[in-house]
C-alpha cells in the first residue's frame, strides 16, 4: 500500500511517561501468587493501519475499552510473551536474554496477522518500564518480576488495528511445592499442538483449549499435563521437557524434543541446551564433576522409549523447564491408567537438573556472567 | 462448591431493556458489508462464580471496559455463534433452527471452560433482541440479520468470570460475486483442525490461525482456502463441504466429511443432509425430478478420490455450505501447484446445489414450512 512508508514505527524515543499519583503497597514476597498483583504501571501503544504506532506510553495500569466486535474476541487474534526481571547482588534490575523473547513475540504476532514492530525499540521500552517498576522486583532466589507483553487485534477482522501492552506482576516460586517433583497426567485424547498448527508460537490460541484438560489432570490428583502427539512426548503443561539418560560410555545424554513446529522454542530450553554443551569444556556446572560429560541433543522421545529407558535403568532424571519454573523435576507420569514412577531425589531436582538450575539462576540474578545473557535495564 | 446452588442462572424473566435514545439510520441493503454495521442494541449479561449470571440486559450497542490481564487476551478463551434472522412474506422476524446454534454455543463454551447457561433462556433472550431490532432485518433473498452470540472469559485465568453478549448486523449476500463459483487453494502446510483439537467447536482459537493462510490464498488469486488433513478434505474457509457424485444406479450421492472431531457440525450442513434425505419420498426439491434419487452420506473424502471422480466423470458438483453463504458452488481447486477445474454452471450453482439452496432459503424466509425449522421471534 502506498501509505506504508508513512506509518510510524514503534519508537522508544517517543515514549511518554505519566506516573501514577498514588503507588500501591508492594505485597510481601511470601504472599505473592503467580501473576495476581499487577504493578503500578503498564507500557501501552496502539496501532492503526493509517497512522501506524502511537507514541508509546508508560502510564498507570488500568482497564481499557474495546468494541464488542473486536476481532480478538471472535478470532483469538492475540500473541504474548512471558519474561522476567531480576535484581541481583548489585541491586540493579536485569532481564534474561530478552531479545529471544521479543524476537519470538514478533514471530507470534506475524503468525496471527498482527502488526509488526521493531524488536530493539520494544526492548528499550520494556527496560524503561522495568526501571520505573524497580521497587516491585522481589529479591531472593526464585523471586522476580514477571513481565507480560501482549499484542491483541481490536476492531474488525481485516482492519489490522491492534493494542500492544506490557504489564508486570511480582512473582515467587511458580509452584507451591517449590522444587518438589511434579506428577503429570499424559494426555492422549487432547492434543496441544500438531504439524501445521501453531505450537511453535506463543499465541493465545494454544492455551485456551488446554484449560479443561489441565483441570481434568488436577481433578485426578496430578499437578499438570504431559502433552503427547500419538506416542511422542511434546511438552509438559506450558513447559518444555528434558530427559537425562545414562550412556554406555559413562557420559550423560540430555535430550529434548526437536523444534518441529509443535514445540515452543523456549528461552529456558535453549539456555539449558547451551549450558549443557558448555560443560565441562567452557564452564563447569555447579555440583557436577568436570569428568561427567554432558551430551545435549534435540531428538524425538516417545512414551515407549521412556518406559524402555526406565526398565533398563538408563533414565536418570526427567524435568520440565520454562521462564516461570526454571527447572522443575518430574517424578511421576500417569499413562494409560497406570502411574510410571520416575527417579526422584531429596530436595527435588536430580544432580543434572539441579546443576543447570543453579547455574541458570546465578546468571539470571547477575551472580554469574555468561555470554551477555543477563542484561541490565539501566545503563 | 457449596455456593453453586445459589448462583443465579441466565434468566430471560429478569431481562432489563434500556433502549437507545437515538436510533441509527439503517443502511440501504446494497451498501451492506458483511458484519460491519452493528444495530442499535445488544444483549448483555455477565457471570461471576459467586453470584452467577447477572440480570440480562438489552441496551445500546457500545464498548465495554476490560482489565489488561483478562484471560481472553492471554488464552483466547472465547466461543461464539453465527446465526441469522429473516423476514418472510408475513413480515415477521424468524430464526432458523436456533436451538442447534445455541446447543453448539453451550458445547463450545464448556470446551473453553466458560460458564454454563440455560440454552432455552438464551433463545428467549435472542428472540427478544431480534424483536427489538426488527427494523434492521433487510428483506429480500440473500438478506438477513446476522446474529453473533459471544461468551468471553475476563478476569484471571482461574476466576471463571465471563461476559456474554449478542450483537447483530444486517447483511446481504456473503460473497461479492453472489453465487459465482469459488476458486479454493488447498492448504497442505497449515492445518485448521486435528484429531484431539477443537475443530468441532466454534471457538475463537480455530479462527485466528487461519487469517494468514486465507490471506495467502487471496494473494494468489483464490477466493478461499480448502483445508486438508493429510490428503483428507475437511472444510472450505469457514464452511462445510459437499461433493455430488453420479452413481452407477442412476442415483446421486451427496457426501460430506463425517463429524470426526475435526469438522464443525454446521447447522446448514445438517439441514442439507436432512433435506436431501427427504427427497423425493417426503418432499420434492425444487427443480429436481422426483425420479432422481439422492443418497446423502457422511464419509471421508480425499484429494486423490476427488481427482479420480473427476477423471471418471462422476463428480457432478462441489459446493460449500454455511450460515453466511447458505450454498456456494466451488469451481476450482488449486492443489500442488496446478488448478483442478470442477464442473461449473451458468448462474453459479449446479442443479443439486441450487435445489437445496432454494428449498433452504424458502424455509428460512418462512415461504415453506418444514419441521418447525423456521422459528418466529414474536409469539
Over which residues does each language-model region extend?
Chain A
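Helix-start/capping segments and mature chain N-termini
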Residues: 1-129, 153-379
Amino acid at each position: 500500500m502506498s501509505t506504508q512508508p508513512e506509518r510510524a514505527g514503534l519508537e522508544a524515543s517517543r515514549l511518554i511517561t505519566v506516573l501514577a499519583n498514588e503507588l500501591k503497597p508492594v505485597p510481601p514476597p511470601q504472599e505473592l501468587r503467580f501473576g495476581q498483583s499487577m504493578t503500578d504501571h503498564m507500557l501501552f501503544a496502539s496501532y492503526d493501519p493509517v497512522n501506524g504506532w502511537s507514541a508509546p506510553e508508560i502510564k498507570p495500569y488500568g482497564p481499557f475499552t474495546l468494541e464488542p466486535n473486536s476481532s480478538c474476541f471472535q478470532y483469538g487474534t492475540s500473541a504474548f510473551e512471558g519474561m522476567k526481571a531480576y535484581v541481583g547482588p548489585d541491586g540493579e534490575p536485569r532481564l534474561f536474554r530478552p531479545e529471544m523473547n521479543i524476537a519470538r513475540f514478533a514471530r507470534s504476532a506475524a503468525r496471527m496477522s498482527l502488526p509488526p514492530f521493531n524488536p530493539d525499540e520494544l526492548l528499550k521500552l520494556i527496560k524503561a518500564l522495568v526501571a520505573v517498576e524497580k521497587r516491585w522486583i522481589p529479591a531472593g532466589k526464585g523471586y522476580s518480576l514477571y513481565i507480560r507483553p501482549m499484542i491483541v487485534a481490536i476492531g474488525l477482522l481485516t482492519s489490522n488495528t491492534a493494542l500492544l501492552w506490557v504489564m508486570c506482576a511480582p512473582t515467587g516460586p511458580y509452584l507451591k511445592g517449590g522444587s518438589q517433583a511434579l506428577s503429570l497426567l499424559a494426555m492422549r485424547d487432547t492434543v496441544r499442538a500438531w504439524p501445521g498448527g501453531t505450537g511453535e508460537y506463543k499465541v493465545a490460541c494454544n492455551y485456551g483449549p488446554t484449560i479443561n484438560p489441565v483441570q481434568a489432570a488436577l481433578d485426578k490428583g496430578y499437578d499438570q499435563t504431559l502433552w503427547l502427539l500419538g506416542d511422542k512426548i511434546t511438552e509438559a503443561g506450558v513447559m518444555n521437557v528434558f530427559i537425562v539418560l545414562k550412556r554406555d560410555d559413562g557420559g550423560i545424554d540430555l535430550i529434548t524434543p526437536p523444534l518441529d513446529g509443535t514445540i515452543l522454542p523456549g528461552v529456558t530450553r535453549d539456555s539449558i541446551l547451551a549450558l549443557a554443551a558448555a560443560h565441562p569444556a567452557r564452564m563447569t556446572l555447579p555440583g557436577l564433576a568436570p569428568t561427567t560429560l554432558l551430551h545435549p541433543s534435540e531428538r524425538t522421545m516417545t512414551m515407549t522409549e521412556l518406559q524402555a529407558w526406565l526398565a533398563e535403568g538408563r533414565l536418570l532424571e526427567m524435568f520440565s523447564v520454562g521462564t516461570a519454573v526454571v527447572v522443575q523435576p518430574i517424578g511421576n507420569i500417569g499413562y494409560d491408567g497406570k502411574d510410571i514412577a520416575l527417579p526422584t531425589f531429596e530436595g527435588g531436582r536430580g544432580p543434572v537438573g539441579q546443576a543447570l538450575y543453579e547455574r541458570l539462576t546465578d546468571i539470571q540474578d547477575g551472580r554469574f556472567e555468561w555470554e551477555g545473557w543477563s542484561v541490565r535495564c539501566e545503563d
